[in-house]
Amino acid sequence: MSHRALYPGTFDPITNGHVDVVQRAARLFDFLIVGIYAGHEGRAKQPLFSAEERRFLAEQALRHLPNVRVDVFSGLAVDYARAVGAQAIVRGLRAVSDFEYEFSLAHMYRHLAPDVDVVCLMTSSQYSFISSSMIKEVAQLGGNLTGLVPDHVAEALVQKFRTLVRE
């Protein structure tokens, strides 16, 4: 039996912390699907990058991992996990502050899909302070992103904010 997992998230943008979790999850499972969530219509918080841009950035960051695929999905993560045959959903934990939310989310997933387990991986300590929101703020203000995101993501952020300033 092949063990599949889904690592869902907005990934707006993918960070080195995300890449770290993906690399480690890819060692634990036969196949890992990184699910880029695209269902933001009507929500107050809109992503900076489109779903297809986020997919492209993630694919470039993860192309060295042969057992990882990047998809775009909308709807419930547990429904998508079932649709792709995943037995587990991977979640990354940066700090104790993430735990309460992830704990509640895991119980909701369990309620909705008892057949899908949740596996939480602690981020490596050098990435424990990184969040996509923080990365976007640093990029917008012209800060140094070295070591925080893959180089191509840093370049995409610079270009995106240049474009937004022109508009």
Swiss-Prot record:
Keyword Repeat attributed: no
GO biological process entries: coenzyme A biosynthetic process
Compartments it resides in: Cytoplasm
Cofactor requirements of the protein: Mg(2+)
Assigned GO CC terms: cytoplasm
Annotated EC: 2.7.7.3
Domain of life: Bacteria
Catalytic activity: (R)-4'-phosphopantetheine + ATP + H(+) = 3'-dephospho-CoA + diphosphate
Coiled-coil features, chain-numbered ranges: none
UniProt-annotated binding residues for substrate: 10, 77, 91
Main EC class the enzyme belongs to: transferase
Matches recorded under InterPro entries: Cyt_trans-like, PPAT, Rossmann-like_a/b/a_fold
Major site of localization recorded for this protein: cytoplasm
Swiss-Prot/TrEMBL site (Transition state stabilizer) positions: 18
Pathway assigned in UniProt: Cofactor biosynthesis; coenzyme A biosynthesis; CoA from (R)-pantothenate: step 4/5
Keyword Repeat appears in the UniProt entry: no
Subunit-level organization: Homohexamer.
HAMAP family: PPAT_bact (MF_00151)
Known role: Reversibly transfers an adenylyl group from ATP to 4'-phosphopantetheine, yielding dephospho-CoA (dPCoA) and pyrophosphate.
Name of the protein in question: Phosphopantetheine adenylyltransferase
Recorded name of the encoding gene: coaD
